[in-house]
Regions:
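Aromatic-anchored glycine-rich loop motif in surface-exposed flexible loops
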Residues: 1-83, 94-112, 254-276, 283-300
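Active-site lining segments that contact anionic ligands and/or coordinate catalytic metals
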Residues: 154-156, 220, 271, 278, ...
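Conserved oxyanion/phosphate-binding beta-strand-loop segments in alpha/beta enzyme cores
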Residues: 242-250
């Protein structure tokens, strides 16, 4: 029974993961908790269930997963990437914060927004103060998303999709980043300045930020690790935003976060994809506390 419960726990985790994704996209969705034996089953055409009902089922699935999944440090090396108790807690944090703030600001029917925020807070506190299985990566923001940040040795990893050497499963991340992916100016403006303030309030932003190089001045250093400077080494030579080879970036801000120069050919990418990381837990914890209380007074 223990073995069966372990695999049921994995299935329940992914059911919660995907139902949460459906709720984010569609709101109310049909909640199907059985396999269909025949196409004549009336539930095939079942109507939508309230989003609160679906989210509560997600919590139940994740609670079961939390009881029966292994701790992340007990997962064998060959099974790295399988879901763990940490992943279940991380999903509770993600769902609780999202649903809590959604109900608070959109006033969707059913449930209490503070109850969802409390779910996120409780799960985050269990990870941060009780289990202490995770910590932030210390070897640089840029390396976090490259091969350096892979595996169990990086304690920031909570749940990742593992990609392998050629011949197994690979991706086109670096190739696509250098093809059509671009950051909008609106997203760029969310990067704070060194005084901790956004563009419209900062006292240290340059008088002009028309050129691409201007946008990096007195900015959160993570911006320079996320998009290219002009003439910075990139795919097929230095990045020149207004030349023909670089015009696939519709907004002129080319993404370099996660780009690996040696993996620019089709299906050659093998660095793992982070799905849940510890930084998300920390910032979600702070946000959930603020949304619940209107302030953050936790001395921890």
């Amino acid at each position: 029974q223990t073995i069966k419960d372990r695999w049921l726990a994995e299935a329940f985790f992914f059911r919660a993961y995907h139902y949460f994704d459906l709720v984010k996209k569609y709101g109310d969705v049909p909640l199907i908790l059985k396999a269909f034996d025949t196409t004549s089953d009336p539930d095939i055409k079942r109507g939508r269930d309230p989003r609160e009902t679906v989210i509560q089922q997600c919590y139940e699935d994740l609670d079961f997963a939390l009881q029966h999944l292994p701790e992340i440090d007990d997962i064998p090396e060959g099974d790295w990437g399988r879901v763990s108790q940490s992943a279940a807690l991380g999903m509770i944090v993600r769902i609780g914060l999202y649903e809590g703030t959604h109900k608070k600001y959109h006033q969707t029917p059913g449930g209490d927004y503070k109850a969802h925020l409390q779910k996120a807070i409780d799960a985050a506190e269990e990870m941060i103060y009780i289990r202490k299985d995770h910590e932030l990566y210390q070897n640089g923001f840029e390396k976090l998303f490259l091969h350096d940040g892979e595996g169990r040795q990086n304690k920031e990893n909570i749940f990742v999709k593992v990609y392998g050497p050629l011949g197994t499963i690979n991706h086109n991340n670096s190739r696509e980043l250098e093809s059509t992916v671009s950051m909008t100016r609106n997203m760029l403006d969310n990067f704070l300045y060194t005084d901790g303030l956004p563009r419209e309030k900062s006292q240290v932003r340059p008088l002009t930020d028309i050129s691409i190089d201007d946008i990096f001045i007195n900015r959160d250093p993570r911006l320079a690790m996320t998009i290219y400077h002009v003439n910075e080494k990139a795919y097929k030579g230095p990045y020149k935003p207004f030349e023909t080879n670089s015009q696939n970036h519709p907004f002129g801000y080319a993404i370099k976060k996660g780009f690996i120069l040696e993996e620019d050919q089709s299906n050659s990418g093998s660095n793992d994809k982070m799905i849940i990381r510890y930084a998300e837990i920390l910032i979600s914890y702070a946000e959930a506390l603020y949304e619940r209380d209107g302030s953050i007074s936790n001395p921890k």
